[in-house]
């Protein structure tokens, strides 16, 4: 009769893994996905170096109180914002953790197109520091912006869902895939605002058996990047149809026209 195999000690297994990882870091130090520089092995983030994380630029103020689009100091506070004036009333606020400037753009690209889903955790860490307006501060449900089936097959994951799950875990919320995307609308990247709105018109539906998660509740819509808000507006309208009371959008990065930042000529303050 064969002698029973000794049970492995979980602690020793973890120690062995830590040793192997430390040894691998000495032989092949991890490189930052944003700048290709060497990451300090003591840095727990590991995918993006401390310097690149410090270069993520906050959205400058003054800004629109609804969508946080930067305003010139000379703008009137009651002046209609061109960025969000076409949004549905149900999309009450939008906030972003940083501007879509280097290295944020490289981080987003690595998550979406270079097969680095683990970056969703780093992105969620940054998003968890965003101060939410009172209207959605107590929202308990995070809803990811859905992707198409074709992109899901190609990419292997929906980056918005990964971000939403990580963000919800950090902030004590739940995640629910209430929305689904119909057909293949094509990428929004090269489209102008009017074309973006047309491209996503009717592109989303809510899943009836999951609608109870958002009915009569405030909801946080989660995505990686806010550009014109066309996708978020279409999603918010669909969530409102499902019974959501108010919808706030939170993204990792916000795309800003470089001319807008240049015209401010330093008049805006980051905060």
Regions found by a protein language model. Give the residues of each.
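Glycine-rich phosphate/pyrophosphate-handling loop used in enzymes and phosphotransfer proteins
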Residues: 1-271
């Amino acid at each position: 009769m064969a002698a029973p195999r000794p049970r492995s000690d979980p602690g020793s297994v973890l120690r062995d893994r830590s040793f192997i990882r430390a040894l691998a870091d000495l032989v092949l130090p991890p490189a930052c996905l944003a700048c290709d520089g060497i990451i300090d092995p003591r840095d727990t983030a590991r995918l993006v170096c401390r310097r690149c994380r410090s270069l993520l630029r906050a959205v400058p103020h003054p800004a629109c109180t609804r969508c946080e689009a930067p305003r010139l100091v000379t703008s009137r506070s009651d002046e209609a914002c061109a960025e969000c004036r076409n949004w549905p009333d149900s999309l009450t606020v939008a906030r972003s953790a940083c501007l879509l400037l280097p290295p944020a753009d490289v981080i987003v690209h690595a998550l979406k197109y270079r097969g680095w889903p683990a970056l969703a955790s780093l992105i969620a860490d940054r998003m968890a520091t965003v101060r939410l307006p009172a209207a959605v501060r107590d929202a308990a449900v995070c809803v990811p912006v859905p992707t198409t089936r074709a992109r899901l097959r190609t990419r292997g994951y929906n980056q918005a869902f990964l971000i939403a799950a990580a963000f919800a875990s950090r902030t004590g919320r739940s995640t629910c895939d209430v929305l689904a995307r119909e057909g293949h609308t094509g990428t929004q990247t090269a489209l102008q605002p009017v074309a973006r709105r047309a491209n996503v018109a009717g592109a989303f539906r809510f899943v009836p058996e999951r609608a109870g998660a958002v009915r009569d509740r405030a909801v946080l819509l989660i995505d990686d990047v806010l550009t014109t808000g066309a996708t978020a507006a279409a999603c918010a309208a669909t969530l409102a149809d499902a019974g959501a009371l108010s919808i706030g959008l939170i993204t990792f990065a916000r795309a800003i026209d470089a001319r807008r930042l240049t015209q401010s000529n330093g008049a805006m303050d980051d905060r």
